[in-house]
Amino acid sequence: MDNTERSSNGNIQAETEAKEEKKNIKKESVSLMGLFSAADKLDYFLMLLGGLGACIHGATLPLFFVFFGKMLDSLGNLSTDPKAISSRVSQNALYLVYLGLVNFVSAWIGVSCWMQTGERQTARLRINYLKSILAKDITFFDTEARDSNLIFHISSDAILVQDAIGDKTDHVLRYLSQFIAGFVIGFLSVWQLTLLTLGVVPLIAIAGGGYAIVMSTISEKSETAYADAGKVAEEVMSQVRTVYAFVGEEKAVKSYSNSLKKALKLGKRSGLAKGLGVGLTYSLLFCAWALLLWYASLLVRHGKTNGAKAFTTILNVIFSGFALGQAAPSLSAIAKGRVAAANIFRMIGNNNSESSQRLDEGTTLQNVAGRIEFQKVSFAYPSRPNMVFENLSFTIRSGKTFAFVGPSGSGKSTIISMVQRFYEPNSGEILLDGNDIKSLKLKWFREQLGLVSQEPALFATTIASNILLGKENANMDQIIEAAKAANADSFIKSLPNGYNTQVGEGGTQLSGGQKQRIAIARAVLRNPKILLLDEATSALDAESEKIVQQALDNVMEKRTTIVVAHRLSTIRNVDKIVVLRDGQVRETGSHSELMLRGGDYATLVNCQETEPQENSRSIMSETCKSQAGSSSSRRVSSSRRTSSFRVDQEKTKNDDSKKDFSSSSMIWELIKLNSPEWPYALLGSIGAVLAGAQTPLFSMGIAYVLTAFYSPFPNVIKRDVEKVAIIFAGAGIVTAPIYLLQHYFYTLMGERLTSRVRLSLFSAILSNEIGWFDLDENNTGSLTSILAADATLVRSALADRLSTIVQNLSLTVTALALAFFYSWRVAAVVTACFPLLIAASLTEQLFLKGFGGDYTRAYSRATSVAREAIANIRTVAAYGAEKQISEQFTCELSKPTKNAFVRGHISGFGYGLSQFLAFCSYALGLWYVSVLINHKETNFGDSIKSFMVLIVTAFSVSETLALTPDIVKGTQALGSVFRVLHRETKISPDQPNSRMVSQVKGDIEFRNVSFVYPTRPEIDIFKNLNLRVSAGKSLAVVGPSGSGKSTVIGLIMRFYDPSNGNLCIDGQDIKTLNLRSLRKKLALVQQEPALFSTTIYENIKYGNENASEAEIMEAAKAANAHEFIIKMEEGYKTHAGDKGVQLSGGQKQRVAIARAVLKDPSVLLLDEATSALDTSSEKLVQEALDKLMKGRTTVLVAHRLSTIRKADTVAVLHKGRVVEKGSHRELVSIPNGFYKQLTSLQEVL
């Protein structure tokens, strides 16, 4: 599209207001109920069942303490009637086993239902979010979406939402149920104690609420910081060839590192808030204990209750308070999910009714003739309010072909966009058969149009599916007929899998001509009344253009056709040519009429003339006919595109990608990677150890009080209980600093670890050779997913969980020591049951490990589908392919959704089983205590102290093992991380013992070079290629599509290494030279220049980071870019937009040339640098290139042969060999020569 129209001066104030509005929007979070707005009837049933299971599960612990209290009362009075009381203890022990079964079933139901509904709802959210994005009009993508992170919301944000909807809701319900059940039982037992505790609860709630609010705010800011870092990574990896060519790896890593520093600062604040929040909560609970113990002793001494009831009430109330504290992390996760959900729900909520009306409202016509009229149309792009058209009027007669030509920025492509109703006129009307297109049903209207653009957007699916986008319900016969009409059937059938061949991300498996013919087949299948050709052959070489043009000629018959073309040879036979300049019609007429006038059109044509060859047309015509069928297979076989078919990829994956790492080795690697944070880990561990030791000592205090309650002397009860109450109050004072120490330093360690993992990953990714990026599994979407999701999993599942593990380890060691000290028999029996708990959780871990891998990869594939659709939104909108894309996205999500049922039940069963075995252990232990007391082998006080601390130990073991799912996920994420970190690149940019390059003369020689792409080793690109360009000279490489032209440049840049032979620069094998220092002497200008989402100034400076402002401006002047830059309102500070979208093709190319000028290279590599430009832009760019080429060794690949006539040497490639070599004049004099035939195809006159 002509982007000059949008590169004019923008309304800065409007953009500023939009940014402020976005900032305000980002601060929002959805309501708690809003999280579940994607639920259907089955989800409501699952949530109801899961909620019931979670609540019952939570209530079993308070009920456990009821039976426990009865058993304690029996044990305390055992001496009165040993036989009867022992029988009562046995009965209550059996009741505990029954309660354990209830716990087992409820835990199973709760975990499985919430895991399943979380997966289902999030999958639906992802689908609805993508549907809403695809339903937006193009203006949204030009304005609001330019700086947003749409893909981030569908991947990372969705994971946070799923976590909140699933596991964390289950946890919160369970803990809240435990809290409520504990207080209810407390009121029924000793209402005075419970009522007193209610006075403390509001303080705990305020502390927890404040903590949740602070964490929500910090997490929102942290999410934004990580999204910015992800955007940097995505931009770099999507343009990795440019980054490598300009030795920009270090700058990219530095930029990524700076983005991560913002998140690290927020992480410190998060740790501080977490430490203070959790510490304050536990401090209040300890103080509550002190108060309750003192008041309970008062009630016991005055005969208001007995020791067992008092103790049961205290246990229920206190453990219920602990449950409230344990719910805090899950509440924090839900708060994060609410923040993450805001962007997702806002897109869904604001779009559905609006988009539905926009697409489906309006009238349809019975018959469409195809007459199009522009009546006094005025238009300005929403993102750039300068007028493109003012009162533009013209008429395109039905069934006729109209071509629009003109300089860059004249509005050619804008006409095609407006005909498709991507934009609405500011004033005036666009009519179809006399009807304003605004009044027509948009979906129906676009079905009447068929679009073929310059760079056809193909999707990462089969050829058949890509053609099927043209007509949703077409059958295979219709697809084949459309392919035949587009001259595509023969080359498709020659492919290994025919119409089921995967085309790869962006269609990278196919050559330009093949992609274009598939796009034409897509348009043919649609059988449109109106055909729109937007520079449909401008990026093709002469041979491919001839075949594609024949296909277009077939399709254009009897259809209204609008053509925008840079190559004027393609529009010579159209019915009428419309010449645009400055948004106005300057000339209209046929080719011959306009040539006779000698106006703008004639000037453009003269610029494109090549040397006429009188006798070559018939020769080439015959040659093309013979090659039309066979050349297609050659183009696929030797395509310069670097990706392979997916079936080949599966066979040729690098060994390193298959390498498995054991969990222990990965954990050890992680520890080594985290070595700089060991001091933080030590300080955090001190806090965790102290926090862990508090709990068994706390249990000892309780047991001490319990013993005192059964004392017959009131003074003893008063003295002992007050002593414990004072100790607990003191513990409350020191608890806050202990938890602050633990959580602040562990969070700091985790944040620094994830920053280091992300940075190490990013650096490792950028050290790999280009061939590695060509693998489908290493596409940009997958790599950004590893950087974001997997690095986050490593931190949350391992670093964050380490805090809990150390705390519980301290707790377990302290508890076991105390238990064995007081009663080794009781401790031995209860401890003997622990292996059962561990075995149950290990079974759960093994099953989780089996399902997790496919689950992770499926999300990556789905994200790639979404990313591709959003990147090609104009094609999606033009073909009304929203439904097909959504169905493909749904298909990619279906596997993890189906697995959620199985994984949920396995996880729930494993966790429920561990809970059941825990209750059985307690029942066995209490029964055994009664036996020992009955046989006088221990006393009540010692056995209860031993048993109490073991209860706490069992809970800590269960809690630690409950972290198994998160740890397993983190371990799997570590596998992805270390597979990248441990991979040895095939082409090292800093090879040891390589020779530094300080100066390059520029003599380049290919010596018997053979080459195959690493992803498709069975296809030869070059066989013993010999080619040389002398220092300071220029070499033009031409040939049919797939002959290896661009591969020559790829090898010189050392994106790939030859399979055999040598590539030498100044007589030195390129493999012996330091790659970074060599690339600093080379400059690459590509067909589609890769600009970064920063200012024009910074894009030029990318060529030389040490350049001064004056040098940058001089480079821009040399590239004929200075004039258009200073005309912009912000001049050199103008933002180029994502991938340079705010600039026209010619402007982008001149900025890229300025970047190359600033590099001051010894060798210049031009890969089709002007092929995608219109004539006016090409002239300016060619002038800049001519200046740049002087005195430099230059290798240029060009489709337009007029651009290479001045080259010192022209080499013609065919089937991987040089078939002709010489100057332009020498080669055109060879009768029936390859070069002569190629030039004849591009004659205009």
From Swiss-Prot:
Record's compositionally biased regions (Low complexity): 630-646
Topology class, membrane: Multi-pass membrane protein
Keyword Nucleotide-binding belongs to the record: yes
SUPFAM superfamilies to which the protein is assigned, alphabetical: ABC transporter transmembrane region, P-loop containing nucleoside triphosphate hydrolases
Sample GO molecular function, one term: ABC-type transporter activity
Membrane-crossing segments per the record: 48-68, 94-114, 171-191, 195-215, 276-296, 314-334, 686-706, 725-745, 805-822, 828-848, 913-933, 947-967
Bias-annotated ranges (Basic and acidic residues): 647-660
Residues that, per the record, bind ATP 1: 406-413
Broad class of where this protein is predominantly found: membrane
Sequence ranges assigned to domain ABC transmembrane type-1 in this UniProt record: 47-336, 681-969
Protein name as it appears in the record: ABC transporter B family member 13
